[in-house]
């Protein structure tokens, strides 16, 4: 199969996810709705591109006429790291509904190995090279130490910061002087560690 663009990867991942959840591929309208296309015609163009690259076959005469060229089970074993999008309050970060797509990145490239990717929002960690739009490789663990860059959940928000524990308080430090530390009172505020940062993939590398 020829290499896919990030948008084509999104469409292909949606097809796989829908087939896993419902047993059938999505319609063009469903693809357009899930991925924010203006029309089903836009979805059709992406499907044609996937067919040209050998990822799928298009079966004429039916709205769900999409067939994967490789068995779904084989692809799932090698689908790579999940990219986590917006995380809903109170739900596990790796819940299926949070997974936007998968990137074919070998988890063992990172030490310790990565469990998922998180898209960085904002420039609060720019001084250590973590920029807006980057993909942060994360090792899922709650065993963390002062000074590590962690992915933490504070109240309803997921944030990337450098950890400092002070008794019953946690301070999350930005790596940008324009941002103030986030102080968390463990006695009164919900707080969870989701993992530690183990690498960064520059956003432009995927465009």
Swiss-Prot record:
It is an enzyme of class 3 (hydrolase). It catalyses: Hydrolysis of Ala-|-Gly bond in repressor LexA. The record marks 89-90 as: Cleavage. Gene3D superfamilies: Umud Fragment, subunit A, Winged helix-like DNA-binding domain superfamily/Winged helix DNA-binding domain. The active site is at residues 124, 161. GO terms for biological process: DNA repair; DNA replication; negative regulation of DNA-templated transcription; proteolysis; SOS response. One of its GO terms (molecular function) is serine-type endopeptidase activity. Residues 28-48 bind DNA. CDD domains: S24_LexA-like. Keywords: Autocatalytic cleavage, DNA damage, DNA repair, DNA replication, DNA-binding, Hydrolase, Repressor, SOS response, Transcription, Transcription regulation. Its EC number is 3.4.21.88. Belongs to the peptidase S24 family. Represses a number of genes involved in the response to DNA damage (SOS response), including recA and lexA. In the presence of single-stranded DNA, RecA interacts with LexA causing an autocatalytic cleavage which disrupts the DNA-binding part of LexA, leading to derepression of the SOS regulon and eventually DNA repair. NCBIfam families: lexA. Homodimer. PANTHER family: LEXA REPRESSOR (PTHR33516), LEXA REPRESSOR-RELATED (PTHR33516:SF2). This is LexA repressor. The lineage of its organism: Bacteria, Pseudomonadati, Pseudomonadota, Gammaproteobacteria, Alteromonadales.
